[in-house]
Structure formats: structure tokens, C-alpha cells
Amino acid sequence: MIKFTKARKILMGLMVLGQLTAVPAIANAAPTAKETAEIKKYDSLDTAAKDYAKALQEISNYGSREMLKSINPDVDKYVAKINDPTLKKQWEDSNTMLIEQFEVSVYKVNENGNDGEVVFLIKGYDEKALDKYLGDNASQYAKVDSGKDEVEVDIEKYIKLQYNYLKNTKKINLATSTVKFAKGNDNKWQLVK
């Protein structure tokens, strides 16, 4: 089990990476005695690295989901009103892909005697590229009435365009994170306190 204060630091780092500034209440909660006392131990550094990558992914997804329920609540209302199951699914999937976008994997495991270091690779969508794509293709979903200074947006076309982009675009390398481990007297690996 990850020490909760360490998990909070990781969550904060991942949120900063995702340009998210608010902190969910759970991240500010004081750890209980049980949470601070239990640090999971592993027989191998590779196993620890894989387990920790899963934990990092869950923490980032949970934190993002708690902070952002939707990427656009106004579109949520529109989609709920029109009652189109396909469009609703595409919108929900787009929300999930953007809110829970981070993939954490083990990049490198360095074992040196009783000291260990794991480098994690964090991937996600290039949101600037998505914004550029949506901007470059605005004519597919938006009409400008320059006489009235108004823009009419076809939300259904916008959702489909965004969904198809996310579904067909590979995630990019956003960051790496290094975590130190140590082998204790019991010959088991654990996070460095």
C-alpha cells in the first residue's frame, strides 16, 4: 500500500502536469494511522514498479474524475436533451478520454544492490494539437454570421469530430517520474520513506 502522503504528492504532480490546479478533498485528508503504517513490500523491484504504475494511474484518474465531472457541462445538457444514444456514448467516451487520459507505464528499472530507482513514463493527449485540429476544422461544425457577429455551432458534428480525433490519435509522452525504492533487512523492496 502506498503511504498516503506520498500518494498526495504524486496526485499533485500529475494534476499540475494535466494543468489542473484544484485539489480534491480526499487529497487533503490527513492519513490515518493504518495508512501511514503500511507500506507494501515486494519480492522484486520489477513487481513493485508494475504495481506502483497501476497505483499512479488510478490516483491520476481518480483525482481528475473528482475534480472534473465533464469537459463541458453545457454540452452535457444538450446531449441529454436530444436523446441520441450514439451521440451520448461518443460524448461520454470523449469526456472519459480527456478527463482520465493519463497512462502510466514502467519506463526503466534500475537496481543497484539494496537501492532501486524506477522511472515511470506518463502519456496523454497533446491537447494543443487537439485544439489546433478542432480550430483548423471549425468549418465542419461552426458557421460564422459576420453580419450579426454570431457563431452557430453544430454540437453533434463537434462531438463526432472530437471523438474521432481522440479515438484515432496516439497519446504522446508528457513526462517521466522517478521513484526511489530500497531493499530492507527482510530482502523485500519498498518505497523510500
Question: Could you tell me what each predicted segment is?
Answer:
Residues 52, 104-106, 118-120, 179-181, ...:
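Hydrophobic beta-strand residues in large extracellular and virion-surface proteins
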Residues 139-153, 164-193:
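Short beta-strand edge/turn micro-motifs at domain boundaries
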Residues 87-158:
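Surface-exposed, charged secondary-structure patches
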Residues 68-74, 153-160, 172-177:
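Short glycine-rich, low-complexity/disordered patches
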Residues 60-63, 125, 187-189:
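Primarily extracytoplasmic ectodomains and periplasmic/lumenal surface modules that are beta-strand-rich
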Residues 19, 108-110, 169-171:
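Generic marker of residues within folded, mature protein domains
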Residues 30-105:
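Core segments of small alpha/beta cavity-forming domains
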Residues 2-30:
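Sec-dependent N-terminal signal peptides of Gram-positive bacterial secreted proteins and lipoproteins
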